[in-house]
């Protein structure tokens, strides 16, 4: 935002130099990137009148001019401009003048045998234009009593000004206006603010006119003023100078006024040619509609480009024809021109997110869209509109013929509680109640002490603690700060930045503070270490993803693009894509893991609509040794992949149990016959399995790729229940092992059999291991032969054969009772 100090001084008095003001604004949170002293551009350039212009005796394209500079004799100046002629008023750089635009210091010089005593300047030579056709001519009716010959031309060119180029944070939309910055300067200097006088508009409705707003959230307020009898022409110099200081070019008086209001109030306006609007509407009833674009619609904007409108383009429509990209740019077909006599002045509020999407859909970013995207002040819409109408009637003539309005603005009120004790906790003991009230009041906040609060600002030592605790204000937030002042800490920041961060004492901790990690963070770090230890690489993926048509994913309210319109509900899809990318790039199989958050719709009776959780995901597979010198193609099998996962969990202190899920609970990403859920202490913690062959074929992946996804919370809860791990000494007594074999149905899971064996064997059963599976000759159809090795051991004695056989018989009996198995041993 470019701030003209000359304009700023009309809104607030201050005695600071440009450098001092720039430093004060920077410390207050508005970084001043550049101070542009336009006064240096024409220091030494004066007003002159050409008395005579004769051809140069030694050069065909030069003229020798006699220029009256208000002194005793005219100055002789050699000039090459084609428009140099007697009688015109010009800008003359006298000897000794330095022109920064040319990096040139003017001196008397011999020009082909004629001594030239200065230079007649064009606007380009004064830094006001990129290029000029000839020397600049002042209006012939210029008041020479107010500006005599030989006087400084800088006031005539708007070069008696200093411009601050400053940036503000994205939450300070109010800082994109002269009034907004003037409020800050008034608060910094404790001087009163002088807002431009505005006469409230009173007008009858526009006859036979209809206004339709398709979505009140996208356009909560819309106002249109019909003004007739307007004479479009050049703007006065003061208006041109203000626009030039802001980096804008003058177009005509009506358009310049809308740009002036944008700079002054931060409220974008747009003026339509009313007769052209009626022509676009045809014979239909005059109607303005605000809606989203429909398929196939186009609009030729003011920059001359014909744009194909997207579904998220927000439009102003006349009848059925788009005439403007709402909040971004107007249309060429209805622009105000030299023949315009009736205008329709639009003043509206558009939703920031809707405007952002609309602008991005067309690759446009304008001064108007920048302000709408940050959020325009809801409270000053009428003031800005009425100020524009007032200036149009003053500078372009005409009369107001009608007004149309739509207004569904939300309530413009917010009250926050501010505690002096909290201010002191955050900022330090230097904070005094009187300073808080003075600074926040200067910023436009209304403060009132809560009932029962101490009304004394000064704190005596005897009552300091009680007074601080009881000093509480109710703070009414001004409408122009509703977008960024939402909490108590925001008020504390407002006080701190104007009080001055340099005024707070530097307080160091009196005692060393020992840092510590939470149990969750400690456990997460252990997981990372263990997974890296089994050869997996940690990866990170963005949690945003495209939305699914079935609505299974949680959608984002204001997505940046359709590709990022929802949040993920699992880590495995992202890991599959990472595996595919590495495989396609020739990097071989990816062995990786990720720890991240996933999001899902909550199920009843959860009162919250959404839930989020932290998951651990992993992917591994393919040939782990693709460059083996023996050229063996041996991809990782199920048991290797499962063994890596089990070893990682065992190193973390967990003994996982694998169970076969029913088909309706299985993951569609995994092979239906080669996936299992993981359980710990009766809680389901995740799943493991081989990727579905169809998925591998679609992605071009090797056949044997495995994935797992675990929930972090059940693992952490298991650790918390376990408490401190107690050391259990190893038994010094020998073990006794027994084998058991039997025929079992093919659909009977080994995990279920193992559970029954462990339960029947009791505490003396140390381990159970499947060591053989056989299908073929000698095995009944539909069955398989399974053989388990059971190891028994007691911590305090050597088990006798009788004890072991008794336990083994219990196992046989339980297997025969629980399952349709045929014992073989």
Curated annotation (Swiss-Prot):
It catalyses: tRNA(Phe) + L-phenylalanine + ATP = L-phenylalanyl-tRNA(Phe) + AMP + diphosphate + H(+). It is found in: Cytoplasm. Keywords: Aminoacyl-tRNA synthetase, ATP-binding, Cytoplasm, Ligase, Magnesium, Metal-binding, Nucleotide-binding, Protein biosynthesis, RNA-binding, tRNA-binding. Its cofactor is Mg(2+). The keyword tRNA-binding applies. Pfam families: B3_4, B5, FDX-ACB, tRNA_bind, tRNA_synthFbeta. Residues 39-154 form the tRNA-binding domain. Tetramer of two alpha and two beta subunits. This is Phenylalanine--tRNA ligase beta subunit. It comes from Synechococcus sp. (strain JA-2-3B'a(2-13)).
